[in-house]
């Protein structure tokens, strides 16, 4: 959590203003941070809350459950009767996510699908008001076709960690060779969602970079 794309003083000041939440998920959040589980950064969490309160999504799809924290968090701000489908492939995290969802009494609201997101997305149908992608960064570009198919008109796509601690802005030659494929794929992803005829996208330097895309209806598509 030490790598920041914003000045550390600004980040710490923003975090100092954060208030207690109405939900009781702080123990799940702090345990995940202590164990270096990659959950959303505090300021990204607040952005998610704002988007859920604005959009009032009845159906959310999450790619990358980790230990279930962000699903539980988003669900606590969804309208009554709102549901979430979340996907995770890491067995250790799946076990913890199931435990957390059960302990919060949210098994009716949150469905955890286990396995590879690319395969699971292909098999899903229906329409989601908000889709949150927070998984392996090199896979975002491979998720996109199915994510767009599953996103409702005027639905919101939130992609987390898109600035890669600032690396995405650097030349590929400044990136370690082993990270260059991910670097290229994320750049391709950001270019695609910024220029896609169905999407209006803004990229924010929040947390480790968040892209927010709105799926335009047929009549509103960019000319």
Predicted regions and their residues:
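A short alpha-helical cap/connector motif
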Residues: 1-130, 137-158, 162-223
């Amino acid at each position: 959590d030490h790598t920041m794309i914003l000045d550390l003083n600004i980040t710490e000041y923003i975090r100092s203003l954060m208030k207690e939440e109405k939900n009781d998920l702080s123990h799940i959040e702090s345990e995940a941070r202590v164990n270096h589980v990659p959950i959303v950064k505090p300021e990204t969490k607040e952005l998610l809350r704002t988007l859920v309160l604005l959009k009032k999504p009845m159906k959310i799809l999450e790619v990358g459950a980790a230990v279930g924290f962000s699903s539980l968090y988003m669900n606590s701000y969804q309208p009554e009767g709102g549901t979430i489908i979340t996907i995770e492939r890491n067995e250790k995290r799946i076990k913890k996510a199931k435990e957390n969802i059960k302990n919060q009494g949210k098994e009716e609201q949150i469905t955890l699908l286990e396995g590879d997101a690319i395969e699971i997305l292909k098999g899903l149908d229906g329409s989601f008001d908000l889709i949150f992608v927070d998984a392996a960064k090199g896979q975002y570009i491979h998720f996109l076709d199915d994510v767009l198919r599953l996103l409702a008109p005027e639905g919101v796509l939130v992609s987390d960690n898109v600035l890669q601690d600032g690396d995405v802005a650097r030349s590929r030659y400044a990136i370690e060779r082993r990270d260059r494929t991910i670097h290229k794929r994320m750049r391709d992803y950001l270019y695609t969602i910024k220029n896609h005829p169905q999407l209006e996208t803004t990229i924010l330097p929040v947390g480790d970079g968040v892209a927010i895309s709105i799926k335009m209806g047929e009549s509103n598509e960019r000319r």
